[in-house]
């Protein structure tokens, strides 16, 4: 079971709708056109059309699986005093005295450029359930990170 924000669920549902209603029919039509051009063994256009159709089908199945096995998170039901899914947490790396802030999200919402880390990442997992002032330890490739929670907010 995966948990998604309402926004991310809607984005994935919209992508699925586009793929099913527009991209797949276009890919199937293109494949039929390329197939009608004769010898498939020497038809690069046919092979490319088939690759695009297979990629589209794969993405459709992937999105269907995510949406079928996901639940939308109710932000009002989340704790406000502990790090949880959708929490924006500011913390200090005690080894380097560096302050950072990230939002904890599901793996399907992770986007480092947008400041979103997965709850399954080493840092996300270590911070989950912590309160302000508590210290978490995360295992990273560079060694153990000691992180002190400075603030927690829900966006």
Regions found by a protein language model. Name each.
Residues 37, 68-75:
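Short alpha-helical linear motifs
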Residues 57-71:
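Amphipathic alpha-helical coiled-coil segments
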Residues 20-23, 67-71, 131:
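Conserved NTP-handling cores and scaffolds of large molecular machines
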Residues 73-155:
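Non-DNA-binding regulatory cores of transcription-related proteins
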Residues 1-58:
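N-terminal cationic and glycine-rich segments that engage phosphates or anionic surfaces
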């Amino acid at each position: 079971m995966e948990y998604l924000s309402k926004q991310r669920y809607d984005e994935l549902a919209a992508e699925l709708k586009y793929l099913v209603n527009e991209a797949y029919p276009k890919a199937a039509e293109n494949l039929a056109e390329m197939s009608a051009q004769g010898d498939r063994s020497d038809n690069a256009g046919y092979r490319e059309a088939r690759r695009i159709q297979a990629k589209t089908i794969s993405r459709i199945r992937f999105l269907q699986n995510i949406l079928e096995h996901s639940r939308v998170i109710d932000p009002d039901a989340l704790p406000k005093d502990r790090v949880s899914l959708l929490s924006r947490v500011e913390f200090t790396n005690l080894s380097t005295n560096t302050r950072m802030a990230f939002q904890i999200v599901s793996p399907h919402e992770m986007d480092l450029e947008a400041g979103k880390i997965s709850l399954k990442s080493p840092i996300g997992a270590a911070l989950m359930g912590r309160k302000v002032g508590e210290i978490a330890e995360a295992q990273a490739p560079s060694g153990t990170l000691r992180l002190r929670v400075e603030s927690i907010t829900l966006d």
